[in-house]
Amino acid sequence: MTLYDNWADIYDIVYSYVRDDIQFYVERAQQCEGPVLELGCGTGRVTIPVAAAGCEIVGIDNSVAMLDMAKQKAANAGVQPVLELGDMRDFALDRQFSLVIIPFRSFLGLMAVEDQIAALDRIKCHLAPGGKLIFSAFVPELHRLGDDEDSTYHLRDLTDPQTGSRSVLSQQTAVDSYNQVIAVRLSLEQLDFKGEVVRKSYHEYEMRYAYRYELDHLLARCGFEVVDLYGSFDSEEFGPESGEMIWVAKVL
């Protein structure tokens, strides 16, 4: 069982606000001449729109429950992406891809440098000649990370589109600046029609944040050349005010 197995049934509700990257990945998939591989595909948030756009896509995730949800959603959408259980650090597929994507900061879930290198090595082996890797990471802002440390704050109110049930999502973070690790604890309170809490669930995970030139060096060390670095999913050039790093790289 992985961290996300117990979170699969509410993952899409919790992260329903994350939509600004979908069209970006769909367009990049349409532009490439060949199949697409998504690592950390989860419930198919990006996989299914890419497949619906007519692109051949394979999705890999290490959570059985998340993949089951993705398969159900794909069937409902009338698309047939290939969805497989696997780990981005050691996956081995008997084929190559024109594009490999790692959306929504999933690369930051690799907590050790050795894991990052292993994943990039696997990606390099699965990229066809001229193929590209695209992944995203947030820009670490130390003053903001410090403000959030050990505090609990309200993120958003949620409504299940199928049942109409309401929930309140809160987040607590702890920052280890020495190891560049953020520990996140999400709390989901599900409410009845009176607004009283009837169920409370938690989800904890860690991310190892990384800086621009740290990732630049990591890619170079692993045999990649940076083609583009965007600061938003509108393909704006990365700059001082950017909150995202969207990396586009190819094998040297």
What are these regions (language model features)?
Residues 1-42:
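Conserved class I S-adenosyl-L-methionine
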Residues 98-114:
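A short SAM/SAH-binding and catalytic strip from SAM-dependent methyltransferases
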Residues 47-90:
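Class I SAM-dependent methyltransferase SAM/SAH-binding core
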Residues 89-99:
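A short acidic, Gly/Pro-enriched loop at the edge of an enzyme's catalytic core
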